[in-house]
Amino acid sequence: MAKIINVIGREIMDSRGNPTVEAEVHLEGGFIGMAAAPSGASTGSREALELRDGDKSRYLGKGVLTAVANVNGPIRAALIGKDATAQAELDQIMIDLDGTENKDKLGANAILAVSLAAAKAAAAFKGMPLYAHIAELNGTPGQYAMPVPMMNILNGGEHADNNVDIQEFMVQPVGAKNFREALRMGAEIFHTLKKVLHGKGLSTSVGDEGGFAPNLSSNADALAVIKEAVELAGYKLGTDVTLALDCAASEFYKDGKYDLSGEGKVFDSNGFSDFLKSLTEQYPIVSIEDGLDESDWDGWAYQTKIMGDKIQLVGDDLFVTNTKILTRGIENGIANSILIKFNQIGSLTETLAAIRMAKAAGYTAVISHRSGETEDSTIADLAVGTAAGQIKTGSLCRSDRVAKYNQLLRIEEQLGEKAPYRGLKEIKGQA
């Protein structure tokens, strides 16, 4: 038995200079797992609660000492002596101990850090890589895939201080033969984009996720400069590289309207979906995330009707990695893909359940980082171990983003042909 003998929590820093929770789980025999909870900027209202201290005299109220104390106190006491390989049991113990719908007693950041640390300790005990242990927990042992990266090379919205409304403009190197080649293509496009922006006298400073954040006059201008960079880097848009958007539309949804202040345009729900559809007709955009507000379910039904057969429509704030909300979406034919973020739901077991539910319903699952990250690269193993097929982990700079790409390189080196890179086939509506 992989007996837990100690659980340790501590306050560490994330990529935005804010505190977050790191946990260690120690087993008999000297096996240790360590993991850290990420943190989001544009968050869905139904996400599990990230517990912050609120003490303005420390870290402007963003300290996590209460969550850390929950790890070192009640969570530790409940897990000592338990089997780290029994992931579902451990997670349920913590969920029951918390006793709230959104984990606001112990904090999703406390529970998640321990949940992931336990999985890492169990993998070490079993003498296998984390992705292999995750595949076993998922009921899909030995079934792997390298994910197509959605590389966020140009930022707007909540991730940048500029006048672009859409939050993320991403490239997907779908024409690559393997992940290693996909990463190289993305890096070359990223560096070429820097030259293009510099040549136009635009800012080349980067946002939270490592993408550039220039002051462009419209969202269409953002797509145009990316097109220029892709072609200048020697790639064909639509064949070698496709585009993806994260609108984070809840951030500019006001009084039932979509207010694109950067463009000076206001749309009603159907009008904004029509606007997005027009962009997909001008550029090879194959995936749109949070194209409407999380509460605009009628609008989502219309968007799915007009684009769902050919464009991947990803619910992030819409579904918040929650099986209850995803069930409603599936039953009503809303969207066709779910973004998977550990900390929206707060445990590994619940995350795996959301991925399985999505796949069973014919939805795709896109594994994602948060804008506030650490060097923790667990999502790379999650993407491969569940054969999810797609990952969002930022741009090609900032070590908090690159850590995930580097882990994927290591995994591909280990697995070789056992983890195929399927390119466009992984994206809903493109197979």
Curated annotation (Swiss-Prot):
<keyword id="KW-0460">Magnesium</keyword>
<protein>
    <recommendedName>
        <fullName>Enolase</fullName>
        <ecNumber>4.2.1.11</ecNumber>
    </recommendedName>
</protein>
<keyword id="KW-0964">Secreted</keyword>
<dbReference type="GO" id="GO:0000287">
    <property type="term" value="F:magnesium ion binding"/>
</dbReference>
<keyword id="KW-0324">Glycolysis</keyword>
<feature type="binding site">
    <location>
        <position position="289"/>
    </location>
    <ligand>
        <name>Mg(2+)</name>
    </ligand>
</feature>
<keyword id="KW-0963">Cytoplasm</keyword>
<feature type="binding site">
    <location>
        <position position="371"/>
    </location>
    <ligand>
        <name>(2R)-2-phosphoglycerate</name>
    </ligand>
</feature>
<feature type="active site" description="Proton donor">
    <location>
        <position position="209"/>
    </location>
</feature>
<dbReference type="GO" id="GO:0000015">
    <property type="term" value="C:phosphopyruvate hydratase complex"/>
</dbReference>
<comment type="subunit">
    <text>Component of the RNA degradosome, a multiprotein complex involved in RNA processing and mRNA degradation.</text>
</comment>
<dbReference type="GO" id="GO:0009986">
    <property type="term" value="C:cell surface"/>
</dbReference>
<dbReference type="Pfam" id="PF03952">
    <property type="entry name" value="Enolase_N"/>
</dbReference>
<keyword id="KW-0456">Lyase</keyword>
<dbReference type="InterPro" id="IPR020810">
    <property type="entry name" value="Enolase_C"/>
</dbReference>
<dbReference type="GO" id="GO:0006096">
    <property type="term" value="P:glycolytic process"/>
</dbReference>
<comment type="function">
    <text>Catalyzes the reversible conversion of 2-phosphoglycerate (2-PG) into phosphoenolpyruvate (PEP). It is essential for the degradation of carbohydrates via glycolysis.</text>
</comment>
<dbReference type="InterPro" id="IPR000941">
    <property type="entry name" value="Enolase"/>
</dbReference>
<feature type="binding site">
    <location>
        <position position="167"/>
    </location>
    <ligand>
        <name>(2R)-2-phosphoglycerate</name>
    </ligand>
</feature>
<keyword id="KW-0479">Metal-binding</keyword>
<feature type="binding site">
    <location>
        <position position="341"/>
    </location>
    <ligand>
        <name>(2R)-2-phosphoglycerate</name>
    </ligand>
</feature>
<dbReference type="Pfam" id="PF00113">
    <property type="entry name" value="Enolase_C"/>
</dbReference>
<dbReference type="InterPro" id="IPR029017">
    <property type="entry name" value="Enolase-like_N"/>
</dbReference>
<dbReference type="GO" id="GO:0004634">
    <property type="term" value="F:phosphopyruvate hydratase activity"/>
</dbReference>
<feature type="binding site">
    <location>
        <position position="392"/>
    </location>
    <ligand>
        <name>(2R)-2-phosphoglycerate</name>
    </ligand>
</feature>
<comment type="similarity">
    <text>Belongs to the enolase family.</text>
</comment>
<feature type="binding site">
    <location>
        <position position="316"/>
    </location>
    <ligand>
        <name>Mg(2+)</name>
    </ligand>
</feature>
<feature type="active site" description="Proton acceptor">
    <location>
        <position position="341"/>
    </location>
</feature>
<dbReference type="InterPro" id="IPR020809">
    <property type="entry name" value="Enolase_CS"/>
</dbReference>
<comment type="pathway">
    <text>Carbohydrate degradation; glycolysis; pyruvate from D-glyceraldehyde 3-phosphate: step 4/5.</text>
</comment>
<feature type="binding site">
    <location>
        <position position="246"/>
    </location>
    <ligand>
        <name>Mg(2+)</name>
    </ligand>
</feature>
<dbReference type="InterPro" id="IPR020811">
    <property type="entry name" value="Enolase_N"/>
</dbReference>
<dbReference type="GO" id="GO:0005576">
    <property type="term" value="C:extracellular region"/>
</dbReference>
<feature type="binding site">
    <location>
        <position position="370"/>
    </location>
    <ligand>
        <name>(2R)-2-phosphoglycerate</name>
    </ligand>
</feature>
<dbReference type="InterPro" id="IPR036849">
    <property type="entry name" value="Enolase-like_C_sf"/>
</dbReference>
